[in-house]
């Protein structure tokens, strides 16, 4: 069992690595990210300076293993980076690439084309598909449901003092809430309140609808009687109260990419866990919370990502924001721990910035 590096001791571990150890460690990680296979001292000796013998390299590898940076998956096998080693590499050694002009144009053209006259969900779905195609991992987008544009609201009387508020979004989702009715309200007044709301909420998110109704408060008083006004306020209030509990929508594209080059039964089992995690809504809000905690792209390796921890996958994720700079969703790439982090980080970052600009 390999000892993992305690996060607080990483600076000390970094200081203890001389240039030769750093070079060997970097070559091991580079080889793993490229091929996914263990690398041995003999293979390393062929690509390192000729002054380093296999025996010298083995001694350095032993030190790296003692630090918890690498491990041997089998007896007499080469070495692979541990999860802690990958985190150490990402934090201390990784040099981020930059998107080419062609890649930027491709991302911008695809996202903007999908957003032109289309629903927000369609644009986010296309962004997920695009991230999958460019990363060879699975692209994912998490959108808070309360940010979907609204289409229609209707009040259906259940009892003299209760009604069902039915909210329909432009993507076809339907949500129901029971609201308390003001004493003495009639069916005609229910229709009045519904018609007034529909005239002002269509195409707006729930947050925007609340802001708009507050803005036209005087108009509301002039157009509606007291009981209908009360119902309008209660109808929006019940949705506002449930807003934080609305489930998030996870859009995933490119699952098939994760099946490429998978042969070991253990890897298949890990993928099974990952697919199960992506099918459940439980805990998806954690993903949004993780993205919200940072101002830009965040990288979660293996069990650092609690949502998909059983699958041993890595996640590169960034938040996107609305016109008020509020985090309203997250997007990214999930895949094996040997993701091409240096290329995927700027890709995710640029896509998140682009979608944020389109939501303003």
UniProtKB/Swiss-Prot annotation:
Say what the protein does: Negative regulator of class I heat shock genes (grpE-dnaK-dnaJ and groELS operons). Prevents heat-shock induction of these operons.
User: Which GO molecular function terms does the record list?
Assistant: DNA binding
Domain of life according to the entry: Bacteria
Q: Which Pfam families match?
A: HrcA
What is the protein name given in its UniProt record?
Heat-inducible transcription repressor HrcA
Can you supply a Gene Ontology BP term from the record?
A: negative regulation of DNA-templated transcription
Cross-referenced Gene3D superfamilies: 3.30.450.40, Heat-inducible transcription repressor hrca homolog, domain 3, Winged helix-like DNA-binding domain superfamily/Winged helix DNA-binding domain
Q: Which family does it belong to?
A: Belongs to the HrcA family.
The primary gene name is: hrcA
């Amino acid at each position: 069992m390999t000892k993992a590096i305690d996060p607080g001791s990483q600076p000390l571990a970094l200081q203890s690595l001389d240039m030769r150890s750093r070079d060997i460690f970097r070559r091991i990680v580079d080889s793993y990210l490229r091929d996914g296979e263990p690398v041995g001292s003999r293979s390393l000796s062929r690509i390192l300076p000729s002054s380093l013998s296999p025996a010298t390299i083995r001694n350095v590898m032993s030190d790296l293993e003692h630090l918890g940076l690498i491990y041997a998956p089998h007896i007499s096998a080469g070495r692979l980076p541990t999860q802690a080693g990958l985190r150490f590499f990402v934090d201390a050694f990784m040099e981020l690439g930059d998107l080419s002009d062609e890649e930027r144009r491709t991302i911008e053209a695809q996202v903007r084309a999908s957003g032109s006259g289309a629903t927000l969900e369609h644009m986010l779905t296309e962004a997920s598909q695009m991230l999958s195609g460019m990363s060879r991992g699975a692209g994912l987008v998490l959108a808070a449901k309360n940010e979907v544009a609204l289409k229609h609201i209707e009040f259906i009387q259940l009892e003299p003092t209760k009604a069902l508020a039915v909210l329909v979004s432009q993507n076809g989702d339907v949500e129901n809430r029971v609201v308390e009715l003001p004493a003495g309200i009639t069916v005609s007044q229910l229709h009045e309140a519904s018609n007034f709301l529909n005239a002002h909420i269509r195409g707006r998110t729930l947050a925007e609808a609340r802001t708009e109704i507050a803005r036209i408060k005087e108009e509301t008083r002039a157009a509606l009687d007291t009981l209908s006004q009360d119902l309008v306020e209660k109808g929006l209030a019940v949705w506002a109260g449930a807003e934080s509990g609305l489930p998030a929508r996870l859009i995933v594209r490119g699952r098939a990419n994760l099946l490429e080059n998978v042969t070991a039964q253990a890897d298949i089992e890990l993928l099974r866990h990952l697919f199960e995690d992506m099918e459940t809504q439980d805990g998806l809000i954690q993903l949004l919370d993780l993205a919200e905690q940072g101002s830009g792209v965040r990288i979660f390796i293996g069990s650092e990502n609690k949502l998909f921890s059983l699958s041993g996958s890595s996640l590169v994720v960034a938040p996107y924001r609305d016109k008020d700079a509020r985090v309203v969703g997250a997007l990214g790439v999930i895949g094996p721990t040997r993701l091409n982090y240096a290329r995927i980080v700027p890709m995710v970052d640029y896509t998140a910035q682009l979608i944020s600009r389109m939501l303003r």
